[in-house]
């Protein structure tokens, strides 16, 4: 049951990211911004590992981490 809920939250995060991309939100991020986002994403991953056991019962936290991760990943893609 918990795995299915996490998958649903992940899909919502992806949908949110696609919506932001569609509105040109991520295209507005310049190179310096992309570097800053990558640094934040890296720090977020290590922080998430530290917090995994303390917030494992709070599903909403995982939803936001996935959303932030999707946005950061999308922002790092090279522009064609």
Curated annotation (Swiss-Prot):
<protein>
    <recommendedName>
        <fullName>Uncharacterized 8.8 kDa protein in atpI 5'region</fullName>
    </recommendedName>
</protein>
């Amino acid at each position: 049951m918990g795995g299915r809920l996490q998958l649903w939250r992940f899909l919502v995060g992806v949908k949110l990211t696609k919506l932001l991309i569609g509105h040109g939100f991520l295209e507005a991020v310049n190179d310096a911004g992309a570097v800053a986002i990558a640094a934040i994403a890296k720090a977020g991953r290590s922080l998430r590992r530290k917090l995994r056991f303390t917030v494992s019962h709070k599903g909403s936290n995982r939803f936001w981490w996935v959303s932030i991760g999707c946005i950061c990943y999308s922002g790092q893609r090279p522009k064609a």
